[in-house]
Amino acid sequence: MFLAQEIIRKKRNGDVLSTAEIQFFVDGITHNTVSEGQIAAFGMAVYFKDMNMDERIALTIAMRDSGTVLNWDSLGLNGPIIDKHSTGGVGDVISLMLGPMAAACGGYVPMISGRGLGHTGGTLDKFDAIPGYQTEPSSELFRKVVKDAGVAIIGQTGDLVPADKRFYSIRDNTATVESISLITASILSKKLAAGLDALAMDVKVGSGAFMPTYEASEELARSITAVANGAGTKTTALLTDMNQVLASCAGNAVEVREAINFLTGQYRNPRLYAVTMGLCAEMLILGGIAQNEAEARHKLNTVLDNGKAAEAFAKMVSGLGGPTDFVEAYDKYLPHAKIVRPVYANTSGFAYKMDTRELGLAVVTLGGGRRKPGDALDYSVGLTQVCALGQEVNKDVPLAMIHAQSEDAFAEAAAAIQQAIIIGDSAPEKTPEIYRYIRASDL
């Protein structure tokens, strides 16, 4: 038997906690036998004194096991359970293509996603734009769709990782969100509760990223790779660029349109294609579906070209209650904004630098994101045809198309976009879409 205050004291003094002590404290979070004040103090102690990798692994496993851990054995699936997680960005629509692509290659993707908060969009919010789609299905329906379609993208259910829900809400109110140890455990406990064999982690870098610097993003990527592999799930992290909007758009319905155009081959934004392929290929390799990068890419391009990936998306949407002809007739079902109009730069030149975070906040201002949890969203609003860094803009080539519901909202977003995209006399140096891979062998 331990005392919560002694565990807090030990960590406050910079000592290493045992697995049993961490397990005891997490049990206390789950069952309300440690107080909010004690949880806040523990979070602050970890924030200042940190945890070593063994402590992080113990915390992740204890939080993962605080609720239901999904088990897929009874379904007799003939492929690996694989998934991807992103630290969040703007125009990051990857999940909508990657899940169906991996499924069409023989993987099973039970993706438990979140809603947007702050400047980043949430995968679940995009699916809420699809009429009838159930983001919170019963566990029976979730399992059925994973088996039949190979992929199901849903929200976190109440019985998964209850310790994280309580701990995170307290961290949010006590300025301890930014601890690498606690971020690692929070992300991975939720992901690993899905019963995964393998995980590809997308850690964003740049002006639209969650972590403020490249160094901090790399530290988080290393921590996640080490802890996930230590907890028994094969994991690779990719450091990817978020110094500009990833897709050609940002919002909810507008991103669903771009995802379908990508899957059906109507249009594939080259940066979006590069990052999606990098992550998805890594999932196939970790899951044993492909032996190497070349084989993985060949398989992925095949399912994009033969329509199997689009078919998996369609099966998932109809299986979770959406329209059966959604891929063919998506525009009939998705909401449209009243005003769709371009915003131009004040001078001609090249898109030189972007404050991607501010562009994400412009979508929030339009009504496409949340200022606080629980806010209702307008799924029709957002940005499309967002210029890429290095692109020439002038009186004929806009910075973006704004989808707004009122003239006031349009004007506010237009001013924010003009301020967020800096115009230069020449194109900036090109940055890579993927900076590096961090695999278990690199640690």
Curated annotation (Swiss-Prot):
It comes from the Bacteria. GO terms for biological process: pyrimidine nucleobase metabolic process; thymidine metabolic process. Keywords: Glycosyltransferase, Transferase. Gene3D superfamilies: Nucleoside phosphorylase/phosphoribosyltransferase catalytic domain (3.40.1030.10), Pyrimidine nucleoside phosphorylase-like, C-terminal domain (3.90.1170.30), Transferase, Pyrimidine Nucleoside Phosphorylase, Chain C (1.20.970.10). InterPro entries: Glycosyl_Trfase_fam3, Glycosyl_Trfase_fam3_N_dom, Glycosyl_Trfase_fam3_N_dom_sf, Nuc_phospho_transferase, PYNP-like_C_sf, PYNP_C, Pyrmidine_PPas_bac/euk, Pyrmidine_PPase_CS. SMART domains: PYNP_C. It is an enzyme of class 2 (transferase). Pfam families: Glycos_trans_3N, Glycos_transf_3, PYNP_C. Disulfide bonds: none annotated. Its EC number is 2.4.2.4. GO terms for molecular function: 1,4-alpha-oligoglucan phosphorylase activity; thymidine phosphorylase activity. Pathway: Pyrimidine metabolism; dTMP biosynthesis via salvage pathway; dTMP from thymine: step 1/2. One of its GO terms (cellular component) is cytosol. The keyword Transferase applies. The keyword Transferase applies. It catalyses: thymidine + phosphate = 2-deoxy-alpha-D-ribose 1-phosphate + thymine. HAMAP family: Thymid_phosp. Belongs to the thymidine/pyrimidine-nucleoside phosphorylase family. The enzymes which catalyze the reversible phosphorolysis of pyrimidine nucleosides are involved in the degradation of these compounds and in their utilization as carbon and energy sources, or in the rescue of pyrimidine bases for nucleotide synthesis. Homodimer. This is Thymidine phosphorylase. It comes from Shewanella frigidimarina (strain NCIMB 400). The lineage of its organism: Bacteria, Pseudomonadati, Pseudomonadota, Gammaproteobacteria, Alteromonadales.
